[in-house]
């Protein structure tokens, strides 16, 4: 389930981990909206820690990485702007139909592409290849990234694991070797990998 995060305690932990050699803070979350308040308070606590103590500033200025499903509001994006150094963003579906069917979200393409464009200078995009979705999802995703974001870092991922998808037998399996090759060929064909 998790626990309520204390921003001051998190800031002290980030500082301690940085001294021990941590090179970034990775905010992992799917949808960031419920966590934005904690992220912002933690960043403020880090700044306060520097002013209130003799903490070494080198260890307080740790790059902030936001690891997200990229499906969030414009308000959330504005709050995170200037706080997050690198966006590690998932671009899972290449169309609204698949996003609605499997993730039950509306306006997926509009939302995700808007957020990708907004964070494009500090961005790495990940695309999880799903079984049977090379043409409907991988192809359009790769094409959009290639057309819109020429210099972005792009990662094609094959570790899809079926979980709680018995209602969707078409994706209730691992990605086959043939599907891996097909997705790789799509990305290579557009010079994205």
Describe each model-derived feature in a short phrase.
Residues 1-6, 171:
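Canonical Radical SAM [4Fe-4S] cluster-binding loop centered on the CxxxCxxC motif
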Residues 2, 133, 175:
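Catalytic cores of large soluble enzymes that bind and process phosphate-bearing ligands
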Residues 8-11, 15-169:
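Conserved AdoMet/S-adenosylmethionine-binding subsite of the radical SAM
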Residues 121-123, 179-193:
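C-terminal accessory region of radical SAM enzymes
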Residues 138-142, 177-184:
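Short amphipathic alpha-helical surface patches that serve as generic macromolecular interface elements
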Residues 168-179:
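Short, flexible active-site recognition loops that position polar ligands and cofactors
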């Amino acid at each position: 389930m998790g626990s309520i995060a204390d921003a001051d305690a998190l800031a002290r932990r980030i500082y301690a981990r940085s001294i021990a050699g941590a090179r970034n803070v990775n905010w992992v979350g799917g949808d960031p909206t419920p966590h934005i308040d904690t992220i912002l308070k933690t960043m403020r606590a880090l700044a306060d820690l520097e002013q209130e103590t003799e903490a070494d500033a080198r260890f307080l200025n740790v790059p902030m990485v936001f690891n997200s499903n990229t499906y969030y509001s414009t308000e959330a994006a504005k709050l995170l702007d200037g706080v997050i150094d690198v966006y590690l963003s998932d671009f899972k579906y290449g169309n609204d139909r698949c996003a609605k069917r499997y993730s039950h979200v509306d306006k997926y393409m509009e939302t995700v592409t808007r957020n990708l464009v907004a964070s494009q200078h500090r961005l790495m995009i990940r695309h999880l290849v799903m079984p049977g979705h090379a043409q409907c999802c991988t192809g359009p995703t790769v094409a959009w990234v290639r057309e819109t974001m020429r210099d972005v870092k792009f990662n094609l991922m094959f570790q899809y694991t079926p979980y709680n998808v018995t209602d969707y037998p078409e994706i209730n399996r691992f990605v086959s070797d043939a599907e891996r090759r097909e997705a790789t060929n799509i990305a290579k064909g557009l010079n994205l990998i």
